Amino acid sequence: MANTLEQLKSYTTIVADTGDIEAIKRYQPEDATTNPSLILKAAQIPEYRALIDNAIAWAKLQSADIEQQIDDASDKLAVNIGVEILKLVPGRISTEVDARLSFDKEKSIAKAHKLVRLYQEAGVDKSRILIKLASTWEGICAAKELEQEGINCNLTLLFSFAQARACAEAGVYLISPFVGRILDWYKNDTGKDYDAVNDPGVVSVTEIYNYYKQHGYNTVVMGASFRNIGEIIELAGCDRLTIGPSLLEELANSQVAIQPKLLPASTTVAAGEPLTEAQFRWDFNQDPMAVDKLAEGIRNFAIDQGKLEVMLKAKLAN
């Protein structure tokens, strides 16, 4: 019998949630996703030294201003890592817009344009890139404009149905609902343990998936942020699942037989009127878990972006 990972690949597109090229070679995913935390982690890998050196040298040629150099080096490093990953995956790379821009639509769009330009200068067409944006109202509005320009987006830090609905109504290419972080919040809040079937993160993604399919939305649902393989197995059949190296290894070493749990609707019905900004903000605010986890996620990505910039600043000074 095929291992659990190989079985899963027959129902769901598997995406590697890592910037580690060796892990990507090992598990042969379709796509890969990165974020500021993963770029920071990848920057510590000795094999990536040349990519960092290249980003530093390039940034120095763009500007004499140190703050601009840091910004340029950070963007160039993320793209350099993405370019290397794209040599190994047949699909797409997700590269994230600076989390500190999560509440600024125009600056998010400008950063997305810059990342796409850097990829194109490296010979990568925009059809192989997903721009990652936080699922704030401003991020969703930025994604709507980018999608209309033909730049596909991955809306991340998604914890609520309101966020998912707004993304679909904006015509976003893909969303990343965070399964494990939802579970973390509920375990902390209730003190209870949850089996995979009743896992609040699994329940949330299942609801979103079913809503999208019932209403004929094309937005791809990519479950993310897993805590155990039970969550992953319960979401077999989801459009995509992005999984970190340790859980990919556990799936590859497992012989559990799996069946698809999520299935597309046989018929579709028209959706209602799109959410207004006021409705979105109210519905989102009614979910304390989502409010907490979105804010925390943005803060933590911003912290790791800051750590990366400290490292780059030291290298730029040499």
From Swiss-Prot:
Known InterPro entries for this protein? Aldolase_TIM, TAL/FSA, Transaldolase_1, Transaldolase_AS
Q: How does it assemble?
A: Homodimer.
Q: Where in the cell is it found?
A: Cytoplasm
Keywords from UniProt, A to Z, are: Cytoplasm, Pentose shunt, Schiff base, Transferase
Biological source species: Shewanella sp. (strain ANA-3)
- Pathway this chain belongs to: Carbohydrate degradation; pentose phosphate pathway; D-glyceraldehyde 3-phosphate and beta-D-fructose 6-phosphate from D-ribose 5-phosphate and D-xylulose 5-phosphate (non-oxidative stage): step 2/3
Broad class of where this protein is predominantly found: cytoplasm
- Alphabetized HAMAP family for the sequence: Transaldolase_1 (MF_00492)
Q: Which reaction does it catalyse?
A: D-sedoheptulose 7-phosphate + D-glyceraldehyde 3-phosphate = D-erythrose 4-phosphate + beta-D-fructose 6-phosphate
- The name this protein carries in UniProt is Transaldolase
Q: Which family does it belong to?
A: Belongs to the transaldolase family. Type 1 subfamily.
Record: active site: 132
Q: What is its EC number?
A: 2.2.1.2
GO biological process, alphabetically ordered: carbohydrate metabolic process; pentose-phosphate shunt
